Every structure is written in structure tokens, then in C-alpha cells.
Amino acid sequence: MRWLFWSSGSQQAPNNKDNNNSNNNDDDDDDYDNNINKRPPLTPESPSPSHPPCASCSTQATASFSNPRRDWNTSLTAHDWAGEFKDPRNLIPTLLLTGGILFCVRIHRQYLRRIPLATNISPTYFHKRSLFGRVTSVGDGDNFRMYHTPGGRLAGWEWLPFRRVPRVKKELKDRTIHIRLAGIDAPELPHFGRPAQPYSHAAHTWLTNYLLNKRVRVFPYRQDQYGRVVATVYVRRFPWIFLRRDVGLQMLRAGMATVYEAKSGVEFGGEGKESKYRRAEEVAKRRGRGLWKGWKGVGWESPREYKNRMAGVEGEKAAAAAAAAAAAAAAAAGVGGMGELGVNGEKN
């Protein structure tokens, strides 16, 4: 049984060692507490025991607190700003931000800037770019006014509070573009002292029902002598909202206009469009649509013939008025000359 006592003794030895270690640790803790209690309290004048005093550090601190007004030029030039800007971490974001701002400005000027009047349209638009807007009024059978809305609904028009098309006539003054339909000529309404041409009210009513308050796409070609923009106009109408329709072509098919006839300066938007317009006019003429009803009868005249006749009448009136004015002036001069002579034919 001796080996049992030996084994039990070997097992108790570590326990005794652990007890001794715990006792030693307790003694060390007591010594540490005593040393802390015996250490004098720190004061602003006394240095930290773990950090010995440094003469250079105290000098720098004293200088910084004693002179609050520092030399800013020295402090700014002391930093390597050029190196900071050349750092890719700063240079790349700066270039991206600057490029993005310039790109947005260019997009706004080229595509999102609103054009208030026809006279504000740059010649760079003609035959190259288009305008998008809403029709606010129809003045005649072949012209109307449009409020330019660049970008359409994608740019916030019609649904953002600050991008609304005005409805009041007073608010639309000097803010709409006057459009003249290219390639067609509709009967004239009464204006400038001229009487109305047959089917002029019908053509005006047709165009009003077709375009008023609709969004249209305008392809400008030039400005005419009245400050209007001669352009081809497209509109989308229900139920064929995915198919845009040429407004001038639709008027020719309905017999509400004729192909514009002039010696020079006629805009169609291309030779192909002119031939298409003439075919549509020929079909409407054969079927007697609109103003082509009874066009073979006596007294019928096209819009161009009406304009030529009215121009002749106005020319005759102007010539007669000029002759009457000259005769009156001559008569007044003759009466004045007779008054200057005496009874015996001598001057007074």
C-alpha cells in the first residue's frame, strides 16, 4: 500500500504550490496599494513619474500659449498643398466633380433651356434640331402658338410644381413661340381689313380641335417676314399614341388646306415630303373633301389666288389714294398761287 501514499502525496504537492502562489499574489497586491497610497499627489508643477520633464516640450508649449497670433503665411506655406492636390485620392474626385458640373451645364444649355419667343431661336436649330412644347392657342388655319417645354415630362414638365404651363392669357404674353405650318396654305380668316375666305372658319376649327392643349414636336426651318417659325409639326393622338402624325399632311388629306405655292422660299422639309403633300392634295381634290367641294365651279379660288386678288385690290386702293392726295396737293398749291396775285395781275 506504499504506492498509494506516494500517489496521494504527489497529488497534494501541486495544491500546496498553488496555495503558495496565491499567497504571494495577495502580498504583491498589498504592496502595490501601499506604494500608491504613499505616492505624493500630482500637481501642475510636478512632472509625471512615468514621463520625465522635457525642456524642449515645455519651451514649445510656452511659446504656443504665450503667442496666440501665429504667422499664418508660414503655417500655410509649411504644408505641401501641391502634393495634396496631386495625390490621386484628391485629384481624381476633383476632376470627376468638375467634369460632371461642366457636363450638366452643357446639357442644360443645349437641351433643357427654355426658348420663350420665336426670335430667340438660334439659327443652329434650323434643319438640325427640334422643339417640344404644348399648344396654347390657334390663330388661323395654318399657324398656332406653342409654349416650349424642353425635355418634356422627363424634365419635370406638367408634374413638378415649378414646371407648369401657364393657362392664363396674361401669363402667356411674350412667352410662346409662333409656329407657321410648312408646305401648306389654309383659307384666310378676316384680318387686316380683308374679308374671310370660304372654309376659313372650318379650317381654323379643324386645327383647333386637332392641336389645342396637345404636346407637339416642331422641326423648324426658318423665320418668315412676320416673325413666325416655319416648321413641320408632329403630334400623337389617341388611340395611335405611338404613331406621330404630320399635322400639315393631315390637313391636306382632310381638304382643309392646299399645298403652298410661291416662286421661291417654300419650305417642305425635303423633296420627298413635297411629293407626299402633293399626292395628298390630289386625293382630296378628286374626292371633293373640305374646300375642294365644287372647286370646278365659277368663283372658286384657292388661298393663293385669294391672296393675290386681295393684294391687287389693296394695290389699286393705295394707288387711288395716292392720286387723290396728289390732286389735293396740286389744287391747294393752285389756290395759294392765285391768292398772291392782285386785281391787275400784279403781286401784292
Curated annotation (Swiss-Prot):
Residue positions of the active site: 180, 188, 228
Disulfide bond annotation, renumbered to this chain: none
Transmembrane intervals: 91-107
Residue ranges with Pro residues bias: 41-52
EC annotation from Swiss-Prot or TrEMBL: 3.1.-.-
Compartments in which it is found: Mitochondrion; Membrane
GO CC annotation terms, alphabetical: membrane; mitochondrion
Compositional bias (Polar residues): 59-70
One protein family per Pfam: SNase
Residues given in the record as Ca(2+) binding sites: 185
Location of the TNase-like domain: 129-294
Chief subcellular location: mitochondrion
Low complexity biased stretches: 15-24
An example molecular function term from Gene Ontology annotations: metal ion binding
Residues covered by region (Disordered): 1-70
Annotated membrane topology: Single-pass membrane protein
Domain of life from the UniProt record: Eukaryota
Key words, A-Z: Calcium, Endonuclease, Hydrolase, Membrane, Metal-binding, Mitochondrion, Nuclease, Transmembrane, Transmembrane helix
Similarity annotation: Belongs to the LCL3 family.
Official protein name in the record: Probable endonuclease LCL3
The encoding gene: LCL3
